[in-house]
Amino acid sequence: MGKKKSLFYQFQSSINDSESGHKKFVDKHSQKSQTEQESQPWRIYSFSAKSNLLDTAHNFSGYLKEQYGISKVKEISSDMCQSWLDHCAKSGLSLSSLECYRSNLKKLSHVVNRHFGLHTDFSTTVKHELVIDKTSPREFALSKEEIEMVKSSIVKPCNSSNYFLFSSFCATRINSVEKLMCRDLTFGKDYAVTVRILDDKGGRDRTITVQDKEFYKLCRSLVSNKNPDSLLFGGIKKDSANRWLNRRLHRLGVTVKSQTIGGKAIFKRGNHSVRKFAIQEYCQKQYNLYLEQGLSPDAAKSQAEKDACIRLGHGSEGRSDIIKIYLSAGS
């Protein structure tokens, strides 16, 4: 007696049996132009598409088994599909993830219909009212244009505005520069400035070197007419620096678009968004530098991310988990 095939196995065999095959994917657009036939909706055109389809099938199968106890794809109804998508929405999935699932369900119905000779319909609708709005300004970086907007709005410099400008180059935490003194800055040739940070996060002492004319001029103005032991930012505190930036961003109308339909835009805030911007700029600069030196794209990316980790003050261990958060922050 043959072994009973699981629901996921049925999906998997249907996907693997797609005529395009995962060994010789064809280009979707060239396929249409060459054959001059209507699009065949069951076709899978890439390894990525196949992987996403298998992921959807796996999650969907688990839900159907738990909620409905069914064991055959022919037993799946459109109501069951909608129930699963609603469940995903209520669980906190983003709008983009839900749209991806909706599209994959439709593709799955075409795939199983061809493989098993069925006439299923897995069409669903993403109900926007069920999507939890998790839009958070903490997830975003300021864009280069927004940084320039804030710079242009500064009429009367203060400790908070000076820190904002400083951090847009160095990606420093406020806590890292609270005790920074004028003598901790060393000016070199070709507009190079080396910043010495003592007892940073984790008890590390470290240096940051920035070679930029604008930054050089800023640092010169910060130490002008001050004693070497004077605080560079006059005893700045995190709360005051963030309040200054938040007020500025609010006046300029710098917002994050809501991830849900009809959701309200949220104002960007916090100097952490400046830190994310600065490290993205630095990582890209280092990546380009390593490419010019002859490294492969993968090697250049790896080395640039290590440099970025050091610049952030997380050491030379190359914390990919931390770097990913900073580099993936959208603007």
State where each predicted segment sits.
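N-terminal DNA-binding module of tyrosine recombinases/phage integrases
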Residues: M1-A49
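Basic, Lys/Arg- and aromatic-enriched nucleic-acid-binding interface segment
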Residues: K144-I174
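Short, polar N-cap/turn motifs at the start of nucleic acid-interacting alpha helices
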Residues: F187, N288-L327
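DNA breakage-rejoining catalytic core of tyrosine-based enzymes
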Residues: V131-M149, G202-E214, N227-P228
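Active-site/catalytic core of tyrosine-dependent DNA strand-transfer enzymes
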Residues: Q211-K285
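Short, basic/aromatic-rich helical patch in the C-terminal catalytic core of site-specific tyrosine
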Residues: L105, V177, N271-E292, A308-C309
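N-terminal core-binding DNA-recognition domain of tyrosine recombinases/integrases
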Residues: K28-S136
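Conserved tyrosine-mediated DNA breakage-rejoining catalytic core shared by Y-recombinases
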Residues: K179-L218
